[in-house]
Amino acid sequence: MSHSQSGIYPFQTAALSRKGIAGIVAIEPGACPEPTADMTPYAGLPILVLWGDYVDEFPRWAPRLKNCRAFVAAANAAGAKAEMLVLPEIGIKGNSHMLMQDDNSLDIADLLIDWIGKHVATAE
């Protein structure tokens, strides 16, 4: 799980080796891999890219959201199990970039726990 500027690191790590990586949860990542990059490392990997509100109000973040959408599409085309979740698009509004500190942070945590439980296999 990563947030903001550390958002790219799980993707870079998975591209080097999938050992020990059961899934990736990136919360408002500062970057996603370029959609033209090699997507084979992500084949079969559960990936959630989560975004809150207000992205369009910040010129530096709107292109990052757009790039992450393109990455999710490219990763899925290569066999990943990637999902883009933009909270306002599912009716959850009012979240800042620091979702873990917002008033509904426990609801967001429950959402993440539920997604992980449904999509990420546990180690035996």
Segments and roles (model prediction):
Residues 8-9, 70, 107, 111:
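Extracytoplasmic/secreted proteins, especially bacterial periplasmic and envelope-associated proteins
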Residues 92-94, 98-124:
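Catalytic active-site module of serine/aspartate enzymes centered on a nucleophile-bearing elbow/loop
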Residues 23-87:
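The feature captures the conserved acid-bearing segment of alpha/beta-hydrolase catalytic domains
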Residues 18-20:
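Conserved S-adenosyl-L-methionine
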Residues 6, 56, 98:
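Short, electropositive, low-hydrophobicity segments enriched in small/polar residues
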Residues 12-16:
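Active-site signature of alpha/beta-hydrolase-fold catalytic machinery across serine-
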Residues 1-6, 10:
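Gly/Ala-rich beta-loop-alpha elbow adjacent to hydrolase catalytic centers
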